[in-house]
Amino acid sequence: MAQHAVYFPDAFLTQMREAMPSTLSFDEFISACQRPLRRSIRINTLKISVADFLALIAPYGWSLTPIPWCHEGFWIERDDEEALPLGSTAEHLSGLFYIQEASSMLPVAALFADDNHPQRVMDMAAAPGSKTTQIAARMGNRGAILANEFSASRVKVLHANISRCGIANTALTHFDGRVFGAALPEMFDAILLDAPCSGEGVVRKDPDALKNWSPESNLDIAATQRELLDSAFHALRPGGTLVYSTCTLNRQENEDVCLWLKETYADAVEFLPLGDLFPDADRALTPEGFLHVFPQIYDCEGFFVARLRKMSSLPAMPAPGYKVGAFPFTPLKGREALNVTQAANAVGLLWDENLHLWQREKEVWLFPAEIESLIGKVRFSRLGIKLAESHNKGYRWQHEATIALACPTHAHAFELSAQEAEEWYRGRDIYPQTPPAADDVLVTFQHQPLGLAKRIGARIKNSYPRELVRDGKLFTGNS
């Protein structure tokens, strides 16, 4: 691979020499930082198994190398990368995989390291959604995830990725993460805090990442990280698991933050060693049992991951000062709930007892049952998935619900050709050689739902959301 010029402040290099174990080569660190980052993907097992995905893409000639800490993760090499961006392939558009850096798959692997089954999980700094969607896949779309993002501009991207991946068990919030310890004390079985950091590990992706770096800014960031970790630890139930991670390399934002928590809460904090997380994990293991991943170790981004357990309850933090406001939804029950369920089932939309029906005026929503006890304690930006809008003739089913809930083997499913699927993603109506018999059509490609549509004569009317419509070269080059 060609090298690219990375900007390294002298003080950063001095700090890295001090932080790096003697078993690692500093020259190899510099060399690794200047190599372009390998592309990697994570297969979305909510939609397809790893084996079925590998069989599906076998004709494309993609070279996939397994990522040792993530069964569904692969480094990818493609000869057609310049002609067809990875994000424009049919498999990406339908949510079969997520483009995710390999080392960023580590925190979720650590969160589920004991094959535990948490029912209520918080991702405290969630955008753009790689780890939230990975958590949802590990949970099998059951239970509930509170995905929080402080940056308002990134909440929309977070929702778009959750929707594309067919995830139904998520609630979105837009808060400074420091509120949750007080607002939702000891409410979560597991919490991921992928903390905002100085980003020293991302220089392979962004050669100018360290342009504004300074030792002083590291200390300022670490102070914020301690406050976020304190909040997360208070929001974690006794016996629960917390993973703290960053994409930076200095000790102040990594080991020192975790050791501060241990010093503050003593026996309430137990560090859970990660040396057995995957074969060769011991190469990045610290004396405390954390993983401090320098980029040359596994040829990936620099990363840090710590896993801990909360051993006992803590005194409550002061109550939050904000007002939640009236909750605008009411549960849908009895005959009304039955009518909605039967109408949805008739067009191929199915769900289980993990999701409950709620309504707001003419809108019908599905909320994860596990999140309902948090209603009234925190204000949600978005909760669950919007199932439908009611009107005089029935229900107008929503795109995100179709992607998450549709059964591709339903009697009304209509499989498109590659050329027709490309037309669909361009927002155009479909004129199949043999039109479907049903008026309500579940449009599929590669046996994945693309949307619900109406048949009008010999035409299938396009219902793909306008904001998702694509142009430029699409995926027919793969067919």
Curated annotation (Swiss-Prot):
One of its GO terms (molecular function) is rRNA (cytosine-C5-)-methyltransferase activity. The keyword Transferase applies. Pfam families: Methyltr_RsmB-F, Methyltr_RsmF_N, Methyltranf_PUA, YebU_pre-PUA_dom. GO terms for biological process: rRNA base methylation. It is found in: Cytoplasm. It is an enzyme of class 2 (transferase). It comes from the Bacteria. Belongs to the class I-like SAM-binding methyltransferase superfamily. RsmB/NOP family. This is Ribosomal RNA small subunit methyltransferase F. It comes from Salmonella paratyphi A (strain AKU_12601).
